[in-house]
Amino acid sequence: MEVGKKLELSITADEVEVLSKAIKNEKFQEMLSNYFQEISSPENVKTYQEEVTLLEQKRGNSIEFIHPSPFRALETSVDGKQRCFINICACDKVGKPESKTVRTVQRFGEKWSLPHLLQPGRQNCERKGNISTIYDVCFHPETLHLADKSEKFMDMVKEVAIQGIQKAFKVLLDKSNLKEMDIKYKGVPQSCVIRKPIPGYEAKEPPEERDLSPSTSHLPENSIDVPSKLLQKQPEEPIKPIYAIKYRSVIDLQDFRVSRESARSLRPKEIVITIDLPLLPTVHGMVLEVEEKRLLLESENPSYRLELHLSYPVDENNGKAKFNKHQRQLTVTLPVQPPLEAPQLPGGSPNPTSDPQNENQTRVEERVEEMAEKGGEQHQRGNDNGAAQGRRQVLEDQNGEKEGKKIQKRNERPEHEVKNETLRKKHDEKFELQDVQQENKGNCSNTKEVKCCRRTKDSLDSLIPTTAASPDGQKKHILTQETEKPKGSVEIPTSSQEYLKVPVTSAATAANVNASDETSKRKPTEEQLEDADEDVLPAEQRFQEPEEINVPAAGTLRQNNAAGNEKINDPHTSAGFVLQNKLMYELD
């Protein structure tokens, strides 16, 4: 197995079952505890090392067991995913540091050689369940003594350890976020082996393919030419953490309907950004800025910087960020802004599908265009007439739809409201007809008054309601002539129980004479009213029935004037008739 490669446990389900049963057995527990005591005993450890040394000599190798002494512990990250710990240890079996003076034309300095021993990384499980990697680097005690006195020399030791681990185990360590820990050693110290081939010795057994000999690494020449530059800590750029961007969408069954509006949008609902920060224990000191299409994360200790340009504009005010302390992972959720609304029409109106008025207008325009296209082969005047006729027809259809909506709304209303509205309309129509009648009566009053001094018997008979005796002896009133809308009525009693109703003014006669003319003049007015509004119904004509009134005796109607002529007076009116011939005008 290669150095630094992770161990994989291959075990079957049957083996797990057997092992679980054995652990529950008391005998197995006792044997296991005895084994731990034997391997941890110093005497048994010494015996084990001697046996391994003899075995390696048969293979032609000389080995030495290294027991590291803790000195410093460093913390960083490996490959930007896991936490990494580097234990700098002391061992007297490692080579001593060496230095050489180097002179150039302008300046001179020293070149150091720091031998060190690298131990393969091992996995360590922390209390919270997180997995970390531990590397051990051993230096000679003199090297660590110089590093303890000078911080600049200590920085050189750290750089040598990081470069050696990256070169030997093909990993990438975070130099900018390297920091010292309060403890001297991370984990449990483990011994390692230095294996060297024996010169001139033929191995009885073939050696292993890989030789775990101690490695010695030197700093580059350009970094150690001058002590001032070698020992000076140069500023480094902040590291860019590992991140992942995910686009999240929501599936809704309404998006799969057979409709124009159910088209599924390719625009995501949210953008989820996951950032790994293995060296950041808390979010204290971290700055996160989110703009419409940009995300910036900065941290000074440890030094992180991440700048992302987003593919979609996001709503920075409604974003969410969550930091997981166990995994040391920051999750940022940003809602994507909805797409812009559809562009407006040239007239400035919004999308026509959202407004019924715009739908009607679009329908009118489409029908007008169809009519214009059909009449394109005809004369230009015919096209104009067809377009106008099509527009008029569409407007009539719209009016019909509006009336239908009104009727539908009226049907949805309660019955008592509909009845009240009908009675109100009839009441208004009645008052309108009365106003028209009053105007006609005013015109009649302005006409010339006709004074009748004498009337013949035939003219009186035409105005007087006559009575005829029925076979049963009952009297019936027969109206011989009636005006359509007279101002007053004239009735002359034919017996002792009937009397004559005479108009108050002499203008009533003119009203009766001109009744037919007024009727003919009034008829066009009613027709105009019917044409103006079909909903207005003509008022019903009601004939006034004669009322039974207590009539005074006939003698009270006859009086003799100073000339000796007999005169008939009406107690209810001021009009009277002068009788020239008593026999001719006797009423009894």
From Swiss-Prot:
It is found in: Cytoplasm; Dynein axonemal particle. It comes from the Eukaryota. Keywords: Cytoplasm. GO terms for biological process: axonemal dynein complex assembly; cilium-dependent cell motility; epithelial cilium movement involved in extracellular fluid movement. InterPro entries: Kintoun, PIH1/Kintoun_subfamily, PIH1_N, PIH1D1/2/3_CS-like. Residues 199-223, 338-498, 510-535 are annotated as: Disordered. Disruption phenotype: Organ laterality defects due to altered ciliary motility. Typical randomized left-right mutant leading to situs inversus. Fishes lack directional liquid flow in Kupffer's vesicle (an organ functionally equivalent to the mouse node in terms of left-right specification). Although the number and length of cilia in Kupffer's vesicle seem normal, their motility is completely lost. Homozygous fish are viable but develop primary ciliary dyskinesia. Furthermore, male mutant fish have impaired sperm motility leading to reduced fertility. Required for cytoplasmic pre-assembly of axonemal dyneins, thereby playing a central role in motility in cilia and flagella. Involved in pre-assembly of dynein arm complexes in the cytoplasm before intraflagellar transport loads them for the ciliary compartment. Belongs to the PIH1 family. Kintoun subfamily. PANTHER family: PIH1 DOMAIN-CONTAINING PROTEIN 1 (PTHR22997), PROTEIN KINTOUN (PTHR22997:SF3). This is Protein kintoun. It comes from Oryzias latipes. The lineage of its organism: Eukaryota, Metazoa, Chordata, Craniata, Vertebrata.
